[in-house]
Amino acid sequence: MRTVLLSSCAIVTLGVLAGCSSSSEPEAVGGITECTKEALATPAQDSATALGAENVYSIDTLECADGWAVTSGILGPANAPADGPQGAPTNFIFEAEGQFWIPKATNQVCGTFNPDDPEAYPADAVIPEALYASGCLS
């Protein structure tokens, strides 16, 4: 009797496990992005192009903290004269979501600016405090 009971439990367990592991859904493709200039080059250029179709952006510096990134660089027209201004210093803020860098607007992530204490990190800021100055104050 005990052998029959153990065999029955084993068969039921195998059936349950087989049901859990078989699926017609494809497995999710995931991954985590890296915080490098190379990984942020395309998202930063896409942000520049969103501001103007002819814009180009070159990343000079990159700061990263807690799944967030701030790029600092020069934003300007692709046809800027070689002997003239190339563009303006510009920062872009990104948040990592899996394998992608998602652009974030300062008004959505920097919180409420305090003119009496301009360098204070706002309580309602979403961006990490380590990136607040470079992403929100410059």
Where do the language-model regions lie?
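Secreted/processed peptides and extracellular or luminal domains of membrane proteins
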Residues: 26, 40-42, 70, 116-117
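Short, non-transmembrane alpha-helical segments in secretory-pathway proteins
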Residues: 28-56
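C-terminal motif of bacterial Sec signal peptides marking the signal peptidase cleavage site
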Residues: 16-19
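Extracytosolic low-complexity repeat regions of secreted or lipid-anchored proteins
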Residues: 70-138
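Short amphipathic beta-strand and strand-loop transition segments with alternating hydrophobic
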Residues: 58-63
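Bacterial signal peptide processing site
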Residues: 21-23
